[in-house]
């Protein structure tokens, strides 16, 4: 990964000043099927973790140590992380877990980088376990993660792509669930939430039909501290709450293939 792709260096965030969103305006969504220009690792071994987590990986060692089973690995992925609210909330809830946000929009990615740098500068010893990368998760998930590497994946308020001809752009589909299942460990959890009922039904239906995922009972999700963050940590979730809107969750566990 090219230098500077992670939350390590550059910008005013290093002085502890949180960035202002008005300087990072971008479209609400991007077309995931279009070709964008940004560096893509050939394989997970090419991901230089020192660019993302300098506290855990001294400069230049992140890439070389990726194959070492003893070193920390990214365990959570927030796909389409937006302005990084979920990452910030999860960081203190799981302070010893490496997690990354994956965002296609360049200005939004830059905002999250600066936000993380500012949080690290003003809270020494905290927020070192989160980072962000600009990438297209619908194309390059296997380039970043090994088989069974992730324990949690998040898809919060994704683009609904209302038109039927654009449903192939949706970030949850049977084909993409194959890839997500590959990078998730058995027992790992996939979290989805939306304020669009039709999309909520679509995501739930895809997950129910896929042989490598099963729904988690409601009583179990109520005991999961992560679930509350789904609707409260992100800008989109807060907007829905302010407007008195309804949300639709689908939370599923990665299972092994039934014989």
Swiss-Prot record:
Where is it predominantly found?
nucleus
Give an example GO biological process: tRNA methylation
**Where is this gene product found?**
Nucleus
Q: Which InterPro entries does this entry report, sorted A to Z?
A: SAM-dependent_MTases_sf, Trm8_euk, tRNA_(Gua-N-7)_MeTrfase_Trmb
Q: Where does S-adenosyl-L-methionine bind?
A: 80, 103-104, 136-137, 156, 234-236
- Catalytic residues (positions): 159
Q: What is its EC number?
A: 2.1.1.33
Show the catalytic activity: guanosine(46) in tRNA + S-adenosyl-L-methionine = N(7)-methylguanosine(46) in tRNA + S-adenosyl-L-homocysteine
| Group of enzyme by EC | transferase
Q: What UniProt keywords are attached to this protein's entry?
A: Methyltransferase, Nucleus, RNA-binding, S-adenosyl-L-methionine, Transferase, tRNA processing, tRNA-binding
Q: One GO MF term, please?
A: tRNA binding
- Pathway membership, UniProt: tRNA modification; N(7)-methylguanine-tRNA biosynthesis
* A Pfam family matched in the record: Methyltransf_4
- Choose one Gene Ontology CC annotation of this protein and give it: nucleus
Q: Which family does it belong to?
A: Belongs to the class I-like SAM-binding methyltransferase superfamily. TrmB family.
State the function annotated in the UniProt record.
Catalyzes the formation of N(7)-methylguanine at position 46 (m7G46) in tRNA.
Q: What is this protein called?
A: tRNA (guanine-N(7)-)-methyltransferase
Q: From which organism does this entry originate? A: Oryza sativa subsp. japonica
């Amino acid at each position: 990964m090219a230098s500077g792709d992670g939350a390590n260096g550059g910008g005013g965030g290093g002085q502890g000043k949180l960035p202002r969103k008005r300087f990072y305006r971008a479209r609400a969504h991007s077309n995931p099927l279009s070709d964008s220009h940004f560096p893509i690792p050939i394989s997970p071994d090419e991901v230089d973790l020192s660019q993302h987590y300098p506290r855990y990986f001294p400069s230049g060692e992140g890439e070389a140590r990726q194959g070492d089973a003893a070193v920390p690995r990214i365990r959570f992925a927030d796909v389409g992380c937006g302005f990084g609210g979920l990452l910030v909330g999860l960081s203190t809830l799981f302070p010893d877990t490496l997690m990354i946000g994956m965002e296609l929009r360049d200005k939004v990615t830059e905002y999250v980088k600066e936000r993380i740098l500012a949080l690290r500068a003003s809270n020494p010893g905290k927020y070192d376990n989160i980072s962000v990368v600009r990438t297209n998760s619908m194309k390059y998930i296997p380039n970043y993660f090994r088989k069974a590497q992730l324990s949690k994946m998040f898809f919060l308020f994704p683009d609904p792509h209302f038109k039927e001809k654009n449903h192939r752009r949706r970030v949850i589909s049977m084909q993409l669930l194959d890839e997500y299942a590959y990078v998730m460990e058995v027992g790992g959890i996939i979290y989805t939430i939306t304020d669009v009922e039709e999309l909520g039904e679509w995501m739930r239906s895809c997950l129910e039909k896929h042989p490598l995922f099963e729904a988690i009972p409601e009583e179990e999700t109520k005991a999961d501290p992560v679930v509350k963050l789904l609707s409260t940590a992100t800008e989109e979730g807060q907007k829905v709450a302010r407007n008195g809107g309804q949300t639709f969750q689908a939370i599923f566990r990665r299972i092994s293939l039934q014989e």
